[in-house]
UniProtKB/Swiss-Prot annotation:
Disulfide bonds: none
Name under which the protein is recorded: Protein HVA22
Protein family per UniProt: Belongs to the DP1 family.
Record InterPro entries: TB2_DP1_HVA22
Keyword Transport: no
Tissue: Expressed in aleurone tissue and embryo.
Membrane topology of this protein: Multi-pass membrane protein
Domain of life: Eukaryota
Membrane as UniProt keyword: yes
Transmembrane feature ranges: 5-25, 42-62, 63-83
Localization annotation: Membrane
Source organism per UniProt: Hordeum vulgare (Barley)
Length: 130
């Protein structure tokens, strides 16, 4: 188990930054240069979710230290978010983040009107108004 664990740890140290940062950075630049808005949405959703995961990790670091499978599980999850075959970031954004945003907007009817207009305009620009 010792050598296997060392190999897995080394693989994570190489694959982790490649999957979580290098490929998404490259794909984000390509998306910005393409005329399609769909890929822009995928990569913006990825960076929103990746930032959230990173913030959670910072807060929960003392607990995560004692969970040895956390980093391999995180790597698999972030790969699912990033890889174009799955489009996981768009899926999670649509099913979780956007729904929570709508609930929040529904509760704050008397909130900042400019903020609501900005969100509705962004949704309309991406063809998401239902």
């Amino acid at each position: 188990m010792g050598k296997s664990w060392a190999l897995l740890t080394h693989l994570h140290s190489v694959a982790g930054p490649s999957i979580t940062l290098l490929y998404p950075l490259y794909a984000s630049v390509c998306a910005m240069e393409s005329p399609s808005k769909v890929d822009d949405e995928q990569w913006l959703a990825y960076w929103i979710l990746y930032s959230f995961i990173t913030l959670l990790e910072m807060v929960a670091e003392p607990v995560l230290y004692w969970i040895p499978v956390w980093y391999p599980v995180k790597l698999l999850f972030v790969a699912w978010l990033a890889l174009p075959q799955f489009k996981g970031a768009s899926f999670i954004y649509d099913k979780v983040v956007r729904e929570q945003l709508r609930k929040y907007r529904g509760r704050n009817r008397n909130g900042d009107a400019d903020h609501k207009v900005h969100i509705l305009k962004a949704e309309a620009d991406h063809g998401r108004v239902h």
